[in-house]
């Protein structure tokens, strides 16, 4: 009985030590990779093409680009149809988001011609309600800026689902507002389940040791991603984050439990 008690104490001590080491670990982003490496074949069209029009049957990510003329005053960017979400960038600066419930965004742009980039994600298929038979995804219909219809669109698939993150070409990390892949490392004394705390990050996907482990979104109640022990190893582990809505984070952390808002 005494021997069993000692074993239990030792096991409990090891578990507590592991949990403490996990809680203490901050994962610094040290490398980054641009999205151009995983661009699919682009298509040009006068009006925006939906993901369905682009033969993206399983949804995913699609970049919409055109030019806007600004007079230096605030003006509204408005989309007729969007499913489900778009991060709005102008000149490599993030200005905000659009969604199927928030279809307008006020932009304060300097006077001149600017490249408008809308990084669109389809979150999932409609499985209930009056729109169940309409699973159009992406952007379609009229898009205006300052009440002027925008034309001359380029649509480029972003092949996140097909890419192998370990084969991307990375460079040293530097602060950016653009979407991309962001890499860091962390160490474990033993291979056990952990949780990646994604609090503060925007929206995207995560890989650990080149294996996909999950997605995150700042609007979700749960802010962590479970990483099974089978995806981990003793010693150094690599994490890669694909961030669509870049909040400017340069680190994430480990947790020994699920993290909620």
Predicted regions and their residues:
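Glycine/proline-rich low-complexity spacer/linker segments in large multi-domain proteins
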Residues: 121-151, 246-261
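Exposed aromatic-hydrophobic patches
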Residues: 103-109, 223-230
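Bacterial N-terminal signal peptides that target proteins for export
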Residues: 1-9
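Aromatic-lined ligand-binding clefts that engage carbohydrates, nucleic acids, or primary amines
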Residues: 74-89, 116, 186-209, 216-217, ...
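C-terminal functional regions that serve as terminal interaction/effector modules
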Residues: 122-123, 202-219, 231-261
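Bacterial N-terminal signal peptides
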Residues: 8-17
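Carbohydrate-binding surfaces of carbohydrate-active enzymes
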Residues: 24-133, 163-168, 244-246
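Sec/Tat signal peptide C-region and signal peptidase I cleavage site
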Residues: 18-24
């Amino acid at each position: 009985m005494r021997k069993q008690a000692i074993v239990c104490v030792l096991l409990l001590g090891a578990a507590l030590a592991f949990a403490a080491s996990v809680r203490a670990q901050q994962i610094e982003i040290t490398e980054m990779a641009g999205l151009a490496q995983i661009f699919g074949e682009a298509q040009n069209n006068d009006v925006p093409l939906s993901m369905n029009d682009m033969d993206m049957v399983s949804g995913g990510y699609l970049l919409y680009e055109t030019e806007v003329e600004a007079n230096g005053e605030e003006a509204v960017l408005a989309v007729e149809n969007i499913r489900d979400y778009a991060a709005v960038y102008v000149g490599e600066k993030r200005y905000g988001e659009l969604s199927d419930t928030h279809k307008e965004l006020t932009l304060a742009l300097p006077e001149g011609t600017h490249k408008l980039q809308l990084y669109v994600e389809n979150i999932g298929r409609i499985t209930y309600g009056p729109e169940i038979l309409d699973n159009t995804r992406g952007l379609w219909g009229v898009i205006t800026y300052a009440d002027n219809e925008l034309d001359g669109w380029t649509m480029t698939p972003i092949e996140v689902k097909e890419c192998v993150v370990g084969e991307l070409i990375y460079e040293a990390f530097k602060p950016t507002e653009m979407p991309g892949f962001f890499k860091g490392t962390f160490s474990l004394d033993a291979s056990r389940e952990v949780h990646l705390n994604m609090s503060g990050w925007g929206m995207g996907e995560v890989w650990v040791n080149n294996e996909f482990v999950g997605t995150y979104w700042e609007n979700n109640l749960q802010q962590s991603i479970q990483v099974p022990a089978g995806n981990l190893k003793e010693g150094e582990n690599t994490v890669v984050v694909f961030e669509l809505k870049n909040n400017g984070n340069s680190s994430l952390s480990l947790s020994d439990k699920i993290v909620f808002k």
